[in-house]
Amino acid sequence: MLARSVGLAYAAANRRDFDSVLVGWDPGGQYHPSGDLLPPDLETVFYGHDGYLELWRYWLDAFADIRWDPEEILDFGDRLLVTTQQRGRGSGSGVAVSEPVFQLFTLRRGLVVRQEDFLDRSKALEAAALPTLSGPVSRGQVR
């Protein structure tokens, strides 16, 4: 069930159906993209639905066909770590980009209240605070 829901959210984002994506986002949510993926003059934290859309506008300007394809989900209860493959082609350069991005989602009342993106899996796992978790971790493949 979880893998299906996550897959549907990524599919909606990849087809630019942001109204569907934002149904799962808290209006006061925060998006912390990896600084390695942003130019230095862009904000480092994006707030609320407007901030989420602002960051997507940046991605769509920079990459004609940017997408994130989810490959694995680690479920830690109130946090999900989704391994994705970011793909796109530079709008101006035409250079193809494909790299793993690890997206950590914090959930409250079933809504995303925080998203953090990492290029380093170990840093993403550290941010998920794995040592403080109790109970099993559920692993799922996205279909």
PLM regions and their residue ranges:
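A beta-strand edge to alpha-helix "cap/lid" segment located at domain peripheries
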Residues: 1, 59-143
